[in-house]
Amino acid sequence: VRIKGAHHPPLGPGRLPWTQNLFATRVAAHVFLGAVKGGEPPPDVYFSGHYHVPGDSYDAWPTRALALPSWQLPTSFAYRLGADRPLPVGGVILTCDRGRYEVAKHFYEWQIRKYGAL
């Protein structure tokens, strides 16, 4: 199983719910076609983080792209950039065995709560 990863993906995501999986599909196409054009074997799986928007291209391209969620809840900086609510946090476990792989997603939603005075 060929795996390629980067903190900064080659493309930016849409931040709207209906564009999140399209982001992963665009990344899969970019990585697959870039490898083919460069005469390299394309990776089976490509993963990236940075944008904190989870997504999965599944089998849209021969390279499967996984856009990973954040590992922490939004900070004040994220809200200055326009975040309106926390996206899922978590990660992915990729298990490889004899040329096959399985993806186990561990994403968690956090409820927004109001602060209360004691």
Language-model segment annotations:
Residues 2, 9-104:
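Conserved beta-sheet core of the metallophosphoesterase superfamily
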Residues 7-12, 108-112:
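A short, sequence-level motif marking secondary-structure junctions
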Residues 96-118:
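A short C-terminal boundary segment appended to hydrolase-like catalytic domains
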